[in-house]
Amino acid sequence: METDSFKRQYADILRRYLCGISYQKLSCEYDPSIEETVVQHFRTLNFPNDFLKRMMPIIHASAWIATSTYPFTPRHVQEAIAVYTSLAIAIEDTSKESTHDLKRFQQRLFNRQPQPNLLLQAMVDCLVSLRGIYGPFICDMVAKSTAEYISVCAFEAKYDGTLRPTPSSPDFPYYLRLKTGVAEVYAFFAFPEVLYPEEAFLHEYILAVPDISRYFNLGNDLLSFYKESIVADERLNYIYNCSRVSNSTPLESIWSTHLALITCVENIRKTLSASPQMRRNIDQLINGYVMYHFGASRYKLSDLGIQEVDELRAKICCSTTVDNGVGAYKH
């Protein structure tokens, strides 16, 4: 592709996207004490020191996701989200060296057997601990999605780089994206019991969960494309898979993705219009997830000359640097 021209067109689509969702920068800032709490949590799990050192950029990224995307939740909820995210990223990052354990995760889980892998056992313990923070239905959905995610990590470790969907399999790109992104988990994370008890609110927010999940997936696909496929040469991501099944160009797929995202946000706001507080909180989530990508240097969006990115990066560089460095995680 003609890189400079593509960059300009991509940046223009991002500007249109920000306008289309009425993006507003939030006042939330990175809280390093949440990162410290997560680090201490992992120290209690007896992980080797060299592995903890490897985990540090992952924990940093996870704390930024929790604080930027869920600023309306109490601190203990953000800490739980950061712990879960750290484990999810680490499980994917180590999937090629632990494929055997990943494949047997659910078998051991249902047989009530301990996991031989420290990360997998820590994830089981994390799922249990969430039951004091979220309602039973949400915890069931989180456990279900996590089990799928761990299975697909093993799947990708074997088939990564070999699956190329065709026009006869048009639904496969998003099907795979659903499995790899655990977006349903992050949609439900917005509704802890302390804010939205299931007994009173499940029937309201469940209607918005499909679009919130889609927003997480497609939002990451749109905002991570630059670092994946313009700076780097990734050609097997969601955008390129969509191009293959629709016989379109990558730029056309980016355009259609940004339109789908705007529709998601419109649907969410309409669905939650009868619940003003819930809508305000999810608006914070929508804007905060954009801020997460803008503030994390790994996405390299400061290369594009977008005012909103430059303003946020300047603020971050004057305070706490947010750089999630490593990790192949789909968020």
From Swiss-Prot:
It catalyses: (2E,6E)-farnesyl diphosphate = (E)-beta-farnesene + diphosphate. GO terms for molecular function: carbon-oxygen lyase activity, acting on phosphates. Its EC number is 4.2.3.47. The keyword Lyase applies. It holds the Pfam family TRI5. Keywords: Lyase. It is an enzyme of class 4 (lyase). Terpene synthase that catalyzes the conversion of (2E,6E)-farnesyl diphosphate (FPP) into the volatile sesquiterpene (E)-beta-farnesene. Belongs to the trichodiene synthase family. This is (E)-beta farnesene synthase MBR_03882.
